[in-house]
Swiss-Prot record:
The gene is ChsVII. GO terms for cellular component: cell septum; myosin complex; plasma membrane. SMART domains: MYSc. Signal peptide: none annotated. It is an enzyme of class 2 (transferase). Polymerizes chitin, a structural polymer of the cell wall and septum, by transferring the sugar moiety of UDP-GlcNAc to the non-reducing end of the growing chitin polymer. Contributes to the production of conidia and the ability of fungal conidia to germinate. Involved in the fungal cell wall integrity and the ability of conidia to withstand biophysical pressure. Required for appressorium formation and evasion of insect cellular and/or humoral defenses, promoting the fungal dimorphic transition to the production of hyphal bodies that occurs within hosts, and ultimately to virulence. The chain crosses the membrane at residues 738-758, 774-794, 1043-1063, 1433-1453, 1466-1486, 1494-1514. This is Chitin synthase VII. InterPro entries: Chitin_synth (IPR004835), Cyt_B5-like_heme/steroid-bd (IPR001199), Cyt_B5-like_heme/steroid_sf (IPR036400), DEK_C (IPR014876), Myosin_head_motor_dom-like (IPR001609), Nucleotide-diphossugar_trans (IPR029044), P-loop_NTPase (IPR027417). One of its GO terms (molecular function) is ATP binding. Belongs to the chitin synthase family. Class VII subfamily. Its main location: membrane. Residues 1726-1782 form the DEK-C domain.
């Protein structure tokens, strides 16, 4: 009889007596995996990641000093599956670190069958060709993949074996041709063995071997010896072993000589690769090599270039390795024949009995594939695990297996990994593939050229042409196709990790071989290969290791009772108890997990009648019932069985030290199985496996609702089903009426039919919003137009020619080659286009040297008319000319015309000035030359300069009087009438208009005199004109400038203060650790897994007391975001590690929305999340929506504002001890009783967006700032970009983000008036410090922030777009004397929009919300202060800049045009302001050492038109771009009434019942009575928080949470959903956490596996449902009857004082006795006498009677009983207290 023993079953490991489990439900995190890896490393054991994957940790030290760790179980699995299933298998030996040693040989030895010794010798011979020494690994493999194929028959015996490289070949570049030049690197080991293993001197002489330093290929790094830290490393000894291995595989004699000759030839040929080698040396080398290789020297010397020789060396080396492998395979095959014939044993030591089986029978193969390259191993592994488009994953999906797609970030990383090594995976389409193809083709050409030139029949030709007639087939023949192997085998993974990044030399100094450990290094390896996601995905969906055809399955297991067909198989599977996903019956195949498969195979082996099947049996204990499988109950070798040992550490904080324990382990059952099932949407109570009850992609809807056993709805009204349609009339405020009237006044000319039919605006409210938008855009345009008009054109109206006048100094500023201005006779000219022209007909050339000195000059003394021509009628001779007071500096520039002109030129013409010069110069006229009237007067008075003003014209007679003085008043030079000249002489600098007019008037009677006076005056006007007075100094021209200057000063002052503020807030003081309780709110919408994980991990890793922070994630609907593969809530729950089977009830609450949308449902999850050693409690609220929403794409979605209100309203009700809705009651229960913190302890709320990661010290800095300043109500930190270089849209935002914080917000914060605390990173104070007055959670803020009917344009922009800014505005409005701060030390990173469309959408929201918030800011009473001297008013002005951004851009464009076109004066002030603005900002960067932002500033300046013009214009016009909905349509506004058509059933507040926590806790036997709000203050708690007996783990008394680990003594029920839904019952399930067993039956702890196993006869699961007589709790609306629990011994809700850490013994003789019963006479539930006595005795034993009053004792007793005693009960209590005191 054939041996039927299963080696695998005998050798199985793990706990026995456990049934093979279904899908793994525990979530694997990096930390849990890291801890497991550390433990197995210390124990030198493997770790099973999932059924087909094992992890080991090895170093060269563990490999050298002992056998490296391998998983023999994995090899046994592969063997069992191969022989039993007759399917090929492949074990991938992957390496996650470059320093991991090879485990190929040790893994082969772990197979449960004999391996022929020749195979090991073959590996010894081949590995020196593939490995080399590197600084990080003394034996680094350089091949892509090396496979050992073991061929087995179906009995599991080895029939053949072979070695092969993959077609990816060997990395000859890094291993030979171009080894790194750093110390520690060597080439392939074989070359060093060659140089030290020559057996005889003759052989060494023949080969011409020298020292390694003589060879270019070996000398690059300067390292020639093996590492010194290897105690037994010696090239000589290794070379001897290598030579012996070659002999063992048949390489000896001539084959060996050819082999070593080729190796030596390659070494020498490497010396030709140096481009600096001389020609003679090159010839000599080629001569030597040709003799060794058997080829003509000219072939290498002349037919091959240096590049060709490079290619030839690499190709020939690979060919040589292929030849060695082929010889090895021949030797292995020969030994296998000898073994089969009985001539030899597998170990080669002797003969054995010949085997009876034949090799010609059916066979299977197991390929052990070593993949040392990290990139390749990662790519092929992740592809097979996460890629659902191919391989077995695709087969599963096609067959109907429910496979959840991998996360988008995982898929992106997988795709990147595959693209990096595409050619090795057969992907030749990308750039890497094309490059590889080019290299292969080039190699083939070179090798073929040399092969044909080689000796016929020589060794070289045989190497290159191994198969005659096929040419060069290197890389194909004798190698395996890696993608084909992966696609045709069942894959198993054996992955090696390395414990540290330390060098191997450092490991040698360690005290033990397992001392090396770096959590960061190992964690990086785990995260790089996505092993946590790997484990979660495989264990949850894909961990099927066996699959059968339907008929095959039925046939194989027919002997075990399996029937034919799918129905028969499914029935048999259920009979076996495989109902939890262990077996899946698909369309065509049956899929089995490892535990179930092995259980079936074990049972099959036990069947005697099954002996005819050729399957080995196993020796299993018949009493084990097939459970002794070596697998844990859940089918995983790593994950612990369900249930977790409780913690008895006695800590008063009691946060578990376990990892990622979700609500599934810590929340107990709920309600009565006889209570009516929930009305909550069935899709929200989806019991499908592993779906969190959230449905598939957020839209699964199962029509199976039952309201009560009869199918009737239990309430009086269903707001979801009612279809009321009605008109509502709504009061409109006076302000709204004024605005509507104003809008119609401006848009009356646009008839509504035109908008309705042409504009396609069918709804009246949409048309009204469009009109409002049009008016707003018009007003904004008007404001911008006014600003632009005021700055640019208003001054022109007041002073039309102000830009056509220049002073002499201003003219002098134009002295460039392209800016050539001059003045002449009171006029200014721009002769830039003229001065280069050759305009002289004399020998004087127009050159730059001649002309440029005149730029900016006054040319009165250079170009002047003949005196007799310009002053006619005065008898001036043509020879008369004036002597100029200022001598011309450049004589070549003097243009003297007339009599003294050059006779040979046109200047000799007396009329040249008027005929030639004047017409030409007028073409370049710019304006008047102006003189300050003060300067004219000053020079006239002080210097006696004879010039004067006539009207506004200035005339200077200095040259006239100088000439007279020189010529002693000669008559020919005294040509002006003395009455005229004397006026200028006697009144220098004065306005002589009246005097001169008087002289003219007096001369009228004397014709001769009048003629001379008039001719003299005309001469003065034509020859002595200097310009005009500077009118720009007049009030008319300066008033506008003064106004602008005033605003400029204000702006500059603000900029300066901003600068100072930025410097002021640059301190980096490290505050002391804070201890305030903080809620970290994270609203999640459509973010991706990567963003969510970053956000949650960053919050968990905050350097803050983990017990005092709570992560509260609010998922805004069940929505699949763009790029995601599953809804956002599922992503969040996956990250947090929540059990996918957890399906809490959907509880109603009131949302922010119109009409019936106010009714919403939510689910609450809680637990602990661990990241990098930080364990933080979390609360997840998923808004799942109403029943009617489940078919929609966004069920439950109400917006971010609703998510904020949900938490704010909850905390408001907690603060006021007000009645709560069912969802809030559940939240309170989870926080208070499960997490163990009284919600009222939380003092701050940190709001963080789901795509934001917070720096570690940020929270502590924010809390510290608030603790130091009690006036701070809100505070934010700096938000920077994490994707700053992702695209051009992100690059233009970097500078803006930085400067908006360090200038804008720092400036606002200086005065405590930050106007927008960003929702992505802001912390609010919940209540004031002194009196506990609510702030963020105040009624006023919540009321205004929670407006439901958002039906106007203003409200839409406030509440739908800018909720963060509006919330800040509301806080400022209601708490104006509180501060709103910014601190730059608290930092976070967020993802900016990476595309233009997203940036447009974001800025539309920001800009429009800013505009509409300005309206709200204007209404604040404290806005302007006294005479507008208020910093908030200054902040308002700063924000006003948003509206005038387009005007700013237009003005800057205008400035650029003016400067570029030289059409006006240079705007010095404007340019100086801009320089100051950006200069100060750059100075901020420099002082803060943020050098990179200077570059970002330049990018921002380039993109300034986008920010200041494009985005604002787009935003302004899209103010009405909303989804308006159809439930509420405003059909008209008249007077103070607004008419609304409601096509909606409306919202009935009764659909969301409210109940005080105390009542709810009492009714449901829950701990934590709080008392009312008044009671809170009456008992003396006005300024502090009440901390009763079990409210918090931080109170004096330990809390009563199930997290405390109290065994089975104290389990609490989660809140029952109140009326009108009665008890929202969970459907019975074996796995769900919500069940209906009463407390008396649920005594065992959810955390205790031991109790579960002991009570296995009673219950297979701690979640088992038991019937009970417990009555339903009275609903909140007083409906229904109260059923007494007759004869029920219910478990009382025990006090933490009584059951934690041994503080006191159980209360009374029976701690499980009920404390409540129904009193038929009094008609209410109360404590009976026994319970009161017990409570009194308990309290009196614990208190100090010397310090406690009787009143306090009474209060403690009532607190212990969790009820208030009145009437007879109170009298009994008082009497009993007295009696007990007497007896003490």
């Amino acid at each position: 009889m054939a041996n039927r023993m299963s080696m695998f079953s005998v050798g199985s490991e793990g706990p026995g007596n456990q049934r093979a489990g279904g899908p793994q439900t525990a979530q694997v995190s990096t930390t849990t995996l890291l801890n497991a890896i550390h433990n197995i490393y210390l124990a030198s054991q493997p770790h099973q990641l999932e059924s087909s994957t094992s992890l080991v940790v090895n170093t060269w030290l563990t490999a050298a000093q002992g056998n490296p760790t391998v998983d023999s179980t994995l090899s046994s699995k592969a063997w069992e599956h191969a022989r039993r299933r007759a399917e090929d298998g492949c074990v991938i030996l992957g390496s996650l670190h470059q320093s991991t040693p090879s485990v190929l040989t040790p893994f082969l030895t772990s197979f449960p069958f004999a391996i022929p010794s020749t195979l090991y010798k073959a590996l010894d011979a081949v590995q020196p060709f593939l490995r080399c020494v590197t600084p990080y690994n003394p034996s680094t493999p350089r091949q892509a993949a090396l496979g050992v194929t073991l061929t087995l028959n179906l009995t599991g015996n080895l029939t053949a074996a072979s070695l092969a490289l993959s077609q990816g070949g060997i990395d000859t570049v890094n291993g030979l041709l171009n080894i790194p030049s750093e110390a520690g690197y060597r080439a392939f080991d074989v070359f060093y063995y060659l140089l030290t293993s020559a057996s005889t001197p003759a052989e060494r002489e023949f080969l011409g071997l020298q020292t390694p330093s003589s060879y270019t290929l070996l000398s690059r790094s300067g390292t020639y010896d093996p590492p010194s830290y290897l105690p037994t490393a010696d090239d000589g000894a290794s070379a001897d072993d290598f030579r012996q291995a070659l002999k063992d595989i048949g390489i000896k004699g001539s084959a060996h000589r050819n082999f070593i000759s080729t190796l030596a030839g390659l070494l020498k040929l490497g010396n030709t690769l140096d481009y600096g080698v001389e020609s003679e040396a090159l010839e000599e080398i080629c001569e030597d090599v040709s003799g060794l290789l058997g080829i003509e020297p000219d072939t290498l010397l002349r037919q091959c270039s240096t590049e060709d020789r490079w290619t030839f060396i690499g190709g020939l080396y690979e060919s040589l390795v292929d030849w060695v492998i082929s010889k090895a395979n021949e030797a292995i095959a020969a030994q296998m024949i000898r073994i089969r014939n009985g001539d030899e044993s597998p170990d080669g030591r002797g003969v054995i009995t010949p085997t009876s089986d034949q090799a010609s029978g059916d066979t299977v193969s197991i390929t052990v594939m070593e993949v040392p390259q990290i990139t390749l191993g990662k790519a092929l592994s992740m592809r097979s695990i996460f890629d659902d488009s191919q391989g077995i994953n695709a087969e599963m999906i096609e067959d109907g297996v429910n496979v959840s797609p991998a996360g988008s970030s995982v898929l992106r990383e997988m795709q990147q990994a595959v693209s990096d090594v595409g050619p090795d995976l057969g992907i030749m389409t990308g750039p890497e593939g094309r490059e590889r193809q080019h290299e292969l083709e080039k190699r083939e050409v070179v090798l073929e050229k040399i092969a044909y030139a080689a000796e016929e029949g020589g060794f070289l030709r045989k190497l290159l042409f191994p198969i005659e007639g096929e040419g060069i087939n290197l890389g194909r023949a004798g190698r395996f196709d890696l993608p084909a192997v992966l696609g045709s085998n069942r894959l198993w993974y054996h992955l090696s990790l390395h414990p540290t990044d330390d060098s191997p030399a450092q490991l040698a100094a360690l005290p033990s071989i397992t001392s090396a450990w770096s959590a960061g290094t190992v964690s990086r390896q785990l995260r790089s290969w996505r092993l946590p996601e790997w484990a979660n995905r495989r264990n949850r969906n894909l961990d099927f290791t066996a699959d059968f055809d339907i008929d095959e399955f039925a046939s194989r297991y027919a002997v075990l009772g399996c029937k034919d067909g799918k129905d028969g198989i499914e029935s048999w599977v259920l009979e076996r108890g495989w109902s939890n996903g262990e077996v899946f019956v698909g369309k065509d195949r049956v899929w089995m997990r490892e535990g179930a498969w092995w259980e079936a195979e074990s049972m099959l082996d036990l069947k005697p009648e099954h002996n005819d099947m050729n399957i080995p049996a196993v020796n299993i204990n018949p009493f084990g019932s097939g459970f002794d499988t070596g697998y844990s109950a859940n089918g995983s070798g790593y994950f612990p069985p369900q249930g977790i040992e409780p913690s008895f550490n006695g800590s008063n904080e009691q946060l578990m030290h376990s990892r990622n324990f979700s609500q599934s382990q810590v929340t107990v059952g709920q309600q009565n199985p006889h209570a009516p099932p929930s009305i909550a949407p069935t899709a929200m109570r989806n019991v499908s496996n592993g779906d969190y009850g959230l449905g598939n992609k957020g839209d699964t809807y199962k029509d199976d609702i039952y309201y009560n056993p009869e199918g009737d709805f239990t309430g009086t009204m269903d707001p979801e089903l009612a279809k009321n349609k009605k008109l509502q009339t709504k009061e409109v405020s006076f302000g709204r009426r004024v605005w509507v009237g104003f809008v119609w006044a401006l848009t009356f000319w646009l008839p509504s039919p035109l908008l309705q039919h042409v504009g396609r605006m069918r709804r009246p409210d949409v048309r009204m919003a469009w009109r409002e938008k049009l008016v707003l855009v018009f007003l904004i345009f008007l404001i911008n137009a006014i600003i632009v008009f005021w700055i640019i054109w208003f001054g022109r109206l007041l002073c039309p020619n102000f830009d056509k006048a220049w002073s002499q100094n201003e003219v002098k500023t134009h002295q460039g080659e392209d800016d050539f201005w001059v003045s002449h006779y009171g006029k200014v000219y721009d002769i830039t286009k003229f001065w280069r022209q050759q305009h002289s007909d004399t020998d004087v050339k127009t050159t730059t040297e001649n002309m440029l000195p005149l730029a900016g000059f006054n040319l009165d003394n250079y170009i002047f008319p003949p005196l007799n021509e310009v002053c006619q009628g005065l008898g001036i001779a043509e020879t008369t000319r004036l002597i100029f007071n200022e001598t011309a500096e450049f004589s070549t520039a003097v243009h003297t015309s007339g009599f003294y002109g050059n006779p040979t030129s046109k200047l000799h013409d007396p009329l040249w000035y008027w005929n030639v010069f004047e017409p030409k110069i007028k073409e370049y006229y710019k304006g008047d030359l102006v003189w300050s009237e003060k300067d004219v007067q000053s020079q006239g008075n002080n210097m006696q300069r004879p010039w004067a003003i006539y009207g506004n014209q200035i005339f200077d007679l200095t040259d006239y009087f100088k000439t007279k003085d020189v010529y002693k008043d000669a008559a020919m030079y005294n040509f002006l009438d003395e009455s005229v000249s004397d006026i200028f002489k006697n009144n220098p600098g004065q306005n002589v208009k009246s005097l001169l007019d008087q002289v003219i008037q007096n001369s009228v009677g004397n014709e001769t005199q009048h003629a001379k006076v008039m001719n003299s005056w005309l001469c003065v006007q034509r020859n002595f004109y200097k310009g005009i007075t500077d009118f720009r100094d007049s009030p008319r021209c300066t008033v506008n400038n003064w106004i602008l200057l005033a605003f400029t000063i204000i702006i500059c002052a603000v900029i300066l203060v901003k600068f100072v503020a930025a410097l002021r807030f640059s301190s980096k003081r490290r505050p002391s650790p804070q201890d305030k309780f903080v809620i970290c709110q994270v609203p999640a919408y459509t973010e991706g897994e990567e963003s969510l994980r970053k956000a949650l991990d960053s919050l968990t890793a905050l350097q803050y007391d983990n017990k005092r922070k709570l992560i509260c994630v609010i998922c805004d609907g069940v929505i699949v975001g763009q790029g995601n593969d599953r809804p956002t809530p599922k992503i969040v729950l996956d990250i947090l590690g929540v059990d996918p089977k957890v399906d809490p009830p959907a509880l109603p609450f009131k949302s922010v929305g119109p009409g019936s949308e106010q009714l919403n449902y939510g689910k609450v999850y809680s637990g602990l999340y661990e990241y990098e050693g930080n364990v933080v409690p979390y609360l997840v609220v998923v808004k799942v929506g109403k029943e009617s929403e489940q078919g929609k794409t966004k069920p439950g979605n109400r917006g971010k504002r609703d998510s904020q209100i949900l938490l704010m309203s909850f905390l408001n009700r907690v603060h006021h001890r007000a009645p709560m809705n069912p969802l809030e009651l559940e939240m309170f229960h989870q926080i208070n009783n499960i997490i163990g913190v009284d919600p009222e302890l939380y003092e701050y709320m940190l709001m963080v967006d789901a795509d934001t990661s917070v720096s570690e010290d940020s929270l502590n800095r924010l809390v510290s700032a608030c603790a130091n300043n009690a006036k701070i109500a809100g505070i934010c930190g700096e938000t920077s970009l994490e994707n700053d270089e992702k695209s051009w849209t992100t690059m233009i935002q970097v500078y803006e983000y930085f400067i908006s914080h360090h200038l804008a917000k720092a400036f606002e914060s200086l005065f405590g008036s930050v106007t927008c605390l960003p929702g992505c990173f802001t912390m609010y104070r919940l209540r004031t410090v002194d009196k506990g007055k609510p702030l963020l959670i105040s009624d006023a803020v919540i009321k205004e922030y929670a407006v439901c009917d958002v039906d106007t344009l203003h409200q839409k922009n406030l509440l739908s777009l800018g909720e963060d800014r509006y919330l800040t505005t509301l806080m400022t409005k209601h708490f104006p004397y509180m501060s709103y701060k910014f601190i730059g030390d608290a930092q976070c990173k967020t993802a900016a929009p990476e595309s233009w469309s997203v940036l447009l959408s974001q800025r539309r929201r920001w800009i429009n919300s800013t505009i509409h918030n300005l309206v709200e800011l204007m209404r604040l009473k404290e806005m302007c202060g006294f005479c507008c001297f208020s910093m908030r008013f200054v902040v308002f002005i700063d924000l006003f800049g948003t509206i005038i951004l387009p005007a700013t851009c237009v003005y800057l464009g205008y400035l650029i045009y003016r400067v570029a076109s030289h059409t006006g004066q240079f705007p010095i002030i404007s340019i100086a302001m801009l320089a100051a603005v950006y200069g100060l900002q750059a100075l901020v960067f420099i002082l803060k050492r943020q050098w990179q932002h200077i570059g970002w500033m330049i990018i921002y300046i380039i993109a300034f038109p986008i920010y200041s013009f494009v985005l604002p214009i787009y935003s302004f016009w899209n103010q009405d771009n909303f989804s308006w909905g159809n439930t509420r349509v405003v059909i008209g506004e008249k007077g103070n009434k607004q008419v609304v058509a409601v096509d909606d059933e409306g919202f009935d507040p009764r659909s969301v019942p409210l109940q005080r926590w105390d009542d709810y806790a009492l009714a449901n036997n829950l701990p934590g009575r709080r008392g009312g709000y008044q009671e809170k203050h009456d008992y003396g708690y006005p300024d502090q928080y009440e901390m009763d007996e079990i409210k918090s783990v931080y109170s004096a008394a330990p809390q009563g949470s199930v997290l405390t680990g109290m065994g089975g003594r104290n389990t609490y029920m989660p809140p029952q959903s109140p009326a009108p839904f009665s008890n929202m019952n969970s459907a019975p399930t074996m796995q769900g956490q919500y069940h209906d067993a009463p407390a008396s039956i649920r005594r065992q702890s959810m955390m205790s596996l031991g109790t579960q196993m002991q009570d296995m006869h009673r219950s297979q699961s701690p979640y088992q449902d038991f019937p009970t007589n417990r009555g339903s709790v009275m609903n909140l609306r007083g409906q229904g009857s109260m059923t007494p629990s007759l004869g029920m011994a219910g478990n009382r809700a025990s006090s933490a004082i009584g059951f934690t850490g041994g503080h006191r013994p159980p209360m009374g003789p029976d701690a499980m006795q009920s404390t409540t019963s129904f009193d038929f006479q009094r008609g209410h539930v109360g404590a009976d006498d026994a319970a009161i006595v017990e409570a009194i005795q308990s309290v009196l034993h614990e208190i100090d009677l010397d310090t406690v009053t009787k009143k306090q004792v009474r209060a403690l007793v009532e607190q212990r009983l969790q009820t208030e005693l009145t009437g007879e009960r109170r009298t009994f209590m008082d009497r009993q207290i007295d009696r007990e005191l007497e007896n003490m």
